[in-house]
Structures are given as structure tokens and as C-alpha cells.
């Protein structure tokens, strides 16, 4: 038997450029065991193996490869989106660094017989490897094309200085961003592409112009664009310094200004100025000195990556002075240096969704078109060639679809790499399709010429690229984008989607094409796996898409198929099912608390507080997008995350969400602490007993007080003592069978408080016990001496009949059923209360409307 590290491929994965890595003590048998044959056909094969002396050595190589390729790994899977040659080189480098001997076998085959089938011994799931030894091997996603485009493509606007009316959300963003800067010194503004982040930045930096402001951008073109916009907003060039490598003078109306990279001049200008605005590229930031009151980092997701000093991280990691404002549409959380680091980046002070920009009319709308795999006339020689031909035909179908509505459509095609772009370009040109190609290995002049030709074309045209035009490039007439290869990064997906969404008069909606290797003859959930990352990214920016996935019959969304023969509705149903439940179809991925759209869930919380005058109850239900949810689950998650945030622990909440919560009435007391605050109620109890000669008088421990925000101290005390009475023993065991009450679930500190307060007046609050069991009869009724709480409840029941004035004074609204329904009478009668959530043993869930006329609203 051969032990070793391996890279395997299956046709279903190959279409997505995914490769399986693993280790085994038996290379001959590995691809034949259940984990490979249960859910896949028997078409697995090894790309290569590294045969090792032991299985443990192979496991270390696998762990090292997964660590070094972490940015190309499918989450929680041993799948890498890398070419086999790249993985092979990485595996060999890892083995050498870990001093593991190996034998490399390319495209190996191993004989399988009965003697090779043995049970492998298990190993610890997390082998100990030195990550420090491997850190230099970590593969960082190459973004050279992004930065290259920044410095090649720039089209000046025709705007002139005019009065600009700020949009309402821009004012709100500026206000919340500035407040968070004053509070913590750091703030992130997460705003969708094309929604005016620069204007918001201007509104904020205007508060700092008496001092020094640094505005960092990721390229020369964006530097010019930012300068133009700030100039239009009213910034004077007299107090502006541009730091960048382009010596071309920039002319704005009658003003002009030059960039510089002279370190002596830059340092002197910054240090001597009392007020100054510096606009610089990240690449030139090493020329700056640390002397700013505010530092704005535009497109700040580009700062993220490996934790090391480089031009993009220089200011972030080295500068100590000033407040920090970070602007992005797509935060990045999947790198060692990421925006999860609250100490460096702060949190999101304001968020503006892509869908909000569309509905407000600032961003062009779009439709999703999934493109089915066509049938090929002839069976091709290999899988790679087949996949290429299918994608070519899908691109042609997409262009034909556009031409039915647009005379001269323009479509960007995003490819996996430059190699794929070249191959598709050659095929399309051979077929007579007007296609262009641009990539970072071409001369700058060629790229600019190609881009100009694409923008000015009067014919239907396709432009193939890998990442060159993914960010920051304006193509006003662009109509569509086509993903020729799956993308897994939410940042890449959203940035690509936004390319054709610039708003123009009479511009038709844009189209996003998602090709799938699916047709009506080969439908299975696995073939939808490539769209799951896309759908997750889009759902986070578009709550309407999220709701559509939950309930397509009630929430329409522009999503369809082209090239599909047969039941399009069935294909759409399968696609939605794969997105919601995954390709295994087991777990509802969309209804977890952290996935619920914040605005919708918070709106229900706010409605409950403001309309119903209370915080959620444990059995409140929530009907969202067709899903039947228990609102208390989300509410508890919010409270837990809020407390983590306030304790400066890792939290799922961002500052803008915390601000939303703290805007609610009594959030920090009733919202977080609950309707029955212990210390407050104990203080009232102590005062009450002192004023009433040690008599509790009357307490309601049946309906549990009143949970409303307007509750009287006596109503809150009733709720507290109800829980005390309930916790002093339980009457039922499992399966609802009667048993002696033995439980005592009152926390020790609370028991001490009750002993101290009631003890002052010789009042008995504990129930009688024998050998730890409550005294009770055969029917489970308590037979011990009544406690002072029970006596007070008897008095309460008498007063309901004989002393209604007393009841109304301390339990207002009791006679109208307020306490019985735990709702204000007018809320109960009008049906405004949240529905009651009920789950059944068979898995069904139901929301029952709380009102005089109950009716089911969801089954």
C-alpha cells in the first residue's frame, strides 16, 4: 500500500475549476471508498500524488497546502480553485519546508484488488504544523489587474460646479459616520456602488478642513476622479496637494494642479500647513508623514490581504494620528488582515444596500438570466474542450438574447484567467462574433485602444477580460456581464454585477448572465453549486432577492432561463432550492438569525416596541418572505451580539445596528434586561414591605405581571415573584408525567436577596420540602404551609372581586384583559400584536394571529 497526498478531479468539479486535495494511507483504494462513490459517479482520477513514508506525513502536507491556499479554498471543503500545476508546485514546496520525503507521481494509476481494501487508522483532525515555516508560501489573490486598470482607464466627467442637493441617505450616512468617528475614532461606510460615497466623504471631511485631511485612493485615475468631484463640491485647489506618479497637469475650469512624488516637498508642505487636503494613491503613501486629523481610505477592501507592510497597508499599520474613515461597497473579511479587525477599521457606521439605490432611482436595475448548457452536435475528445465549447455557445446565446431588445448591446465577459480569455476569444472570432480582449500582459496603449473601441462601437460587441474591468471602470453604455467562470468572493461578485448599473436616461435594465452546465436532461442539484456563492453575495446586497428565495410566489424577482427546453419553472425551482438548502438539500441556510435582512427584522422589533409598547415575547412569531420564524430566536441573538459589542468582544453587530437598537425606548434596561428586572423589583419589594408593616398584601402570580414598557412597579414585581414561585420546584418530568417536585432553580444570589428582604419581616417565601421533595398530594398539589407569595395571590384573587379600585391602581387594565393576553386592549382587539409561533411534532410551523378572532396566517 502507498500512503500519500493527492489531488483528484471529477468531471462535475472540473467544470468549476475545482480540485479535491486529500491524504490517505492507501492511494489504491481511496477513490473507491464511500465518500467518493456515494454522491459522485466513478469518474474520479488522480491529477498527481506525492507518495510519502507514512499517512501522517501526507496529512501534514495536506494541512500545509490548505493553509497556503486558504484564499482559493471552498469554505469548509477540501476543494481548491487552482490549477493542478499550481497545487503541485505548492505541495512540493510545503513538503520541502516540513522536511518530508516524497515521490512525485504524475497522472498515477494504482491497482485495486481485495487486498487493498483495509480500514485506515484514524489520525487527529488537526495535525501540528509550523505555520511560521509556511507563511512565505501563502498564495495571495493577484489583484494586479485591478490596480493596472486604475492607472490606465480614466474618462473625465463633463460636470461643472453647480448647486448639489444632497440625498437624504447621504446626509444620514455623513451624520452617522461623523458621530462614530467622534465616538471611536474609526468608521466604515458600506455603500453600494454608484450611490455617492465621495459626496458623503466630502460632507464628513468638511468638518476637518481647519486641519489636515488625507484622502487615499487605489490608483491615478481614481485620484483624478476624486479631485474632480471634490472640486465640483467646492474644494479650493489652493489647499490641495496631490501625491502620485503622473506628472500631467490637471486642468479644472480655470484652475490647474500637478501631482508630485518629491518626498522633501511633500513632507515640508504637510508639516508647515495649518490646513491641507492631501489626495494620494496608496502606492505613493510611503512618501507621506504622519500628521493628519482625518484619513479617508477609499475602496478600503484593497487594503486587506496578508498581514505585512506594503504600500496599501503603510498608512493603516504605521500612522498613529487622526481619525480613520473607510469607504467601500464590498468589505473584505476573508484575509489575515481583514475588516473584521475592529481595532484597525472600526465597524460599519452606515450601510446602504444596492437594492435601495435601485429603488431610489440612482442605480440602474438588472435581471438575472441563467444560461442552460446546449447540446453539442458531436462528442468532443476531452472534458476541457467540451466545457470550452459549451461556454462559447452560452456566450453567443446571451448576446443573441440582448439583441432582441437592444440594437447594439455591449457585454463584458469575466473569465477565470487570461488563458481562458484567450481561448474563448479565439473561438468567438473564428465563429464571426465581434469580440475584443484585454488583459494586463498587453501594452497600455493597446488596452486603451481596445476599451475605446468597445465603448464607441455601434455594433453588438463582447469584451473578454479576467479582472481588468471589475472595479472602478465606467462604461456608460454597458448592458450586461457574463460570468464565464464561477466566482467565490462576494467582493468580486458584487463589483462585477455593478459594472453595467450606471444610471442613464432611457437606458434599459442590465442583464447578469450565469451559465450553468444544466439542461432538461441532466438536472441534479450538484450542477447548481456554482451559483450558490453568487446568490449568497447578491442576497446580502438585495433583500428583495432574499425574500424571493423564501417565497417566490409572493415576491417577484427578474430571474429566468435562456436556452432551456422544457419546464423553465422546474429549473427555477431547483435553482432556488439549491441556493436555499445547498446541493445536499438538508439545512435551510437562509433563515439563520445572522442571515435575516437587518432592516426587515429590526423594523418588526421597532414596530413591536412602538406600537405594542413592549419587547418581544418568547412565543412571538415573524412572517418574512414566506418563512415562518420564531422571532425570539433572532431577538436573543441580537441581545447576545449587542452585549458582546458593548464588552468589546467579537460581535456580529456593526455600529449602525447598535445605533438602531439604542434608538429604541428603554433598550438598555427593558430590551436587554427583560421586563422583570431583578434588582429594581427587589428594591421596590423592600420599600413596599417597610411601608406596609411587612405585609405583601396582593400579588398576581398566575398571569405573571405585565411585560409592557409602561408597567407599574407592582406589575413588574408580580412577574418576578411568578418566576420565583415557578422555579421553586417543578411538577412534571419527561413526557408530562407527574412526579414529586424536587427542583429548585433559583440562583443562589437571588435566594439570598429573598431571604434577606423577607427575613426582616419573618415572612416565609420558600415552599416546604421533605428530603428535598416538595410536600404534595397524589395529584401533585402542594400541601405544605402557604408561602407569603401564595397568601398574597389569594388576596389578589379576592380583591379582583371585592376591591377593583385597588387592582386598577396597581394593575391598570386588568379588568379589560390586558394581563390575560399580555397585550394592550386596543392592540389585542385590532389584531396588531405579533402572531403567536407554534411548532408541531411533525415539523410544521404555524403563526396564529393574536386577536379576539384568532386565525392561522401561515401553515
UniProtKB/Swiss-Prot annotation:
Residue ranges of the motif DEAH box: 298-301
Source organism superkingdom: Viruses
SUPFAM superfamilies, alphabetized: P-loop containing nucleoside triphosphate hydrolases
Keywords: ATP-binding, Helicase, Hydrolase, Nucleotide-binding
Annotated Helicase C-terminal domain residues: 394-553
The protein's enzyme class: hydrolase
Keyword match Zinc: no
UniProt-annotated binding residues for ATP: 191-198
Gene Ontology MF: a single term: DNA binding
Membrane spanning stretches: none
Pfam families, per database record: Helicase_C, ResIII, T5orf172
Domain Helicase ATP-binding: 178-349
Statement: the UniProt record of this protein carries the keyword Hydrolase: yes
Enzyme Commission (EC) number: 3.6.4.-
Family, per entry: Belongs to the asfivirus helicase A859L family.
Descriptive protein name: Probable helicase A859L
Species: African swine fever virus (isolate Tick/Malawi/Lil 20-1/1983)
Amino acid at each position: 500500500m502507498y500512503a500519500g497526498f493527492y489531488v483528484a478531479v471529477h468531471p462535475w468539479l472540473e467544470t468549476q475549476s475545482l480540485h479535491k486535495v486529500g491524504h490517505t494511507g492507501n492511494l489504491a483504494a481511496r477513490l473507491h471508498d464511500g465518500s467518493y462513490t456515494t454522491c459522485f459517479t466513478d469518474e474520479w482520477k488522480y491529477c498527481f500524488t506525492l507518495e510519502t513514508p507514512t499517512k501522517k506525513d501526507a496529512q501534514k502536507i495536506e494541512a500545509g497546502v490548505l493553509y497556503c491556499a486558504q484564499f482559493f479554498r471552498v469554505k469548509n471543503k477540501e476543494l481548491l480553485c487552482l490549477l493542478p500545476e499550481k497545487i503541485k508546485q505548492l505541495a512540493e514546496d510545503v513538503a520541502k519546508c516540513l522536511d518530508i520525503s516524497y515521490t512525485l507521481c504524475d497522472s498515477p494509476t494504482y491497482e485495486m484488488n481485495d487486498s487493498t481494501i483495509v480500514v485506515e487508522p484514524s489520525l487527529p483532525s488537526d495535525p501540528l504544523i509550523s505555520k511560521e515555516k509556511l507563511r512565505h508560501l501563502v498564495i495571495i489573490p493577484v489583484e494586479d489587474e485591478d490596480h493596472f486598470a486604475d492607472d490606465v482607464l480614466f474618462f473625465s466627467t463633463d460636470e461643472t460646479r453647480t448647486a448639489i442637493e444632497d440625498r437624504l441617505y447621504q446626509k444620514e450616512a455623513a451624520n452617522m459616520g461623523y458621530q462614530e468617528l467622534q465616538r471611536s475614532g474609526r468608521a466604515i461606510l458600506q455603500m453600494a456602488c454608484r450611490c455617492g460615497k465621495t459626496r458623503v466623504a466630502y460632507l464628513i471631511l468638511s468638518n476637518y478642513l481647519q486641519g489636515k485631511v488625507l484622502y487615499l485612493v487605489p490608483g491615478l485615475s481614481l485620484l483624478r476622479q476624486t479631485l474632480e468631484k471634490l472640486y465640483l463640491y467646492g474644494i479650493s485647489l489652493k489647499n490641495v496637494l496631490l501625491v502620485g506618479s503622473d506628472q500631467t497637469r490637471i486642468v479644472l475650469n480655470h484652475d490647474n494642479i500637478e501631482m508630485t512624488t518629491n518626498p522633501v516637498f511633500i513632507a515640508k508642505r504637510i508639516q508647515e500647513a495649518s490646513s491641507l487636503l492631501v489626495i494620494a494613491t496608496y502606492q505613493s503613501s510611503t512618501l507621506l508623514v504622519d500628521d493628519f486629523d482625518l484619513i479617508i481610505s477609499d475602496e478600503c477592501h484593497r487594503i486587506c490581504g496578508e498581514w505585512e507592510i506594503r504600500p496599501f497597508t503603510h498608512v493603516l499599520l504605521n500612522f498613529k494620528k487622526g481619525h480613520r474613515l473607510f469607504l467601500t461597497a464590498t468589505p473584505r473579511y476573508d484575509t489575515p488582515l481583514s475588516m473584521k479587525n475592529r481595532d484597525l477599521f472600526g465597524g460599519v457606521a452606515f450601510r446602504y444596500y444596492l437594492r435601495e439605490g435601485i429603488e431610489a432611482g440612482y442605480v440602474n436595475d438588472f435581471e438575472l438570466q441563467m444560461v442552460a448548457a446546449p447540446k453539442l452536435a458531436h462528442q468532443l475528445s476531452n472534458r476541457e474542450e467540451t466545457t470550452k465549447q459549451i461556454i462559447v455557445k452560452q456566450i453567443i446565446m446571451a448576446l443573441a438574447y440582448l439583441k432582441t431588445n437592444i440594437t447594439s448591446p455591449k457585454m463584458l465577459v469575466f473569465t477565470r484567467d487570461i488563458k481562458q480569455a484567450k481561448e474563448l476569444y479565439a473561438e468567438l472570432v473564428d465563429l464571426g462574433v465581434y469580440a475584443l480582449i484585454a488583459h494586463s500582459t498587453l501594452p497600455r496603449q493597446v488596452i486603451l485602444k481596445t476599451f475605446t473601441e468597445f465603448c464607441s462601437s455601434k455594433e453588438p460587441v463582447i469584451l473578454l477580460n479576467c479582472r481588468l474591468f471589475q472595479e472602478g471602470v465606467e462604461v456608460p453604455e454597458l448592458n450586461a456581464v457574463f460570468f464565464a467562470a464561477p466566482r467565490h468572493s462576494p467582493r468580486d461578485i458584487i463589483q462585477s454585477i455593478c459594472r453595467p448599473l450606471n444610471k442613464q436616461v432611457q437606458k434599459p435594465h442590465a442583464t447578469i448572465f450565469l451559465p450553468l452546465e444544466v439542461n432538461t436532461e441532466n438536472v441534479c442539484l450538484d450542477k447548481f453549486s456554482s451559483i450558490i456563492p453568487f446568490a449568497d453575495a447578491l442576497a446580502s446586497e438585495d433583500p428583495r432577492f432574499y425574500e424571493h428565495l423564501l417565497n417566490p410566489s409572493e415576491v417577484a424577482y427578474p430571474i429566468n432561463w435562456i436556452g432551456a427546453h422544457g419546464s423553465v419553472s422546474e429549473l427555477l425551482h431547483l435553482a432556488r432550492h439549491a441556493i436555499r438548502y445547498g446541493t445536499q438539500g438538508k439545512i435551510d441556510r437562509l433563515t439563520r438569525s445572522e442571515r435575516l435582512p437587518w432592516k426587515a427584522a429590526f423594523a418588526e422589533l421597532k414596530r413591536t416596541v412602538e406600537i405594542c409598547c413592549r419587547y418581544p415575547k418568547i412565543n412571538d412569531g415573524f412572517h418574512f418572505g414566506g418563512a415562518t420564524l420564531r422571532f425570539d430566536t433572532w431577538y436573543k441573538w441580537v441581545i447576545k451580539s449587542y452585549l458582546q459589542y458593548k464588552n468589546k468582544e467579537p460581535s456580529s453587530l456593526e455600529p449602525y445596528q447598535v445605533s438602531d437598537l439604542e434608538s429604541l425606548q428603554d433598550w438598555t434596561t427593558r430590551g436587554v434586561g427583560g421586563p422583570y428586572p431583578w434588582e429594581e423589583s427587589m428594591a421596590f419589594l423592600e420599600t413596599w414591605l417597610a411601608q406596609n408593616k411587612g405585609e405583601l398584601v396582593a400579588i398576581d402570580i398566575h398571569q405573571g405581571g405585565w411585560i409592557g414598557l409602561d408597567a407599574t412597579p407592582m406589575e413588574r414585581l408580580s412577574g418576578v415573584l411568578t418566576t420565583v414561585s415557578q422555579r421553586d420546584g417543578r411538577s412534571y418530568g419527561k413526557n408530562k408525567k407527574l412526579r414529586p417536585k424536587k427542583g429548585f432553580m433559583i440562583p443562589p444570589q437571588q435566594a439570598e436577596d429573598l431571604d434577606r428582604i423577607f427575613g426582616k419581616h419573618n415572612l416565609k417565601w420558600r415552599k416546604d420540602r421533605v428530603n428535598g421533595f416538595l410536600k404534595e398530594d397524589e395529584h401533585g398539589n402542594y400541601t405544605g404551609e402557604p408561602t407569603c407569595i401564595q397568601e398574597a395571590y389569594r388576596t389578589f384573587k379576592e380583591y379582583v372581586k371585592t376591591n377593583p379600585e385597588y387592582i386598577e391602581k396597581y394593575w391598570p387594565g386588568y379588568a379589560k384583559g390586558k394581563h390575560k393576553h399580555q397585550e394592550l386592549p386596543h392592540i389585542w382587539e385590532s389584531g396588531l400584536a405579533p402572531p403567536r409561533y407554534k411548532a408541531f411534532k411533525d415539523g410544521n410551523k404555524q403563526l396564529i394571529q393574536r386577536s379576539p378572532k384568532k386565525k392561522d396566517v401561515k401553515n
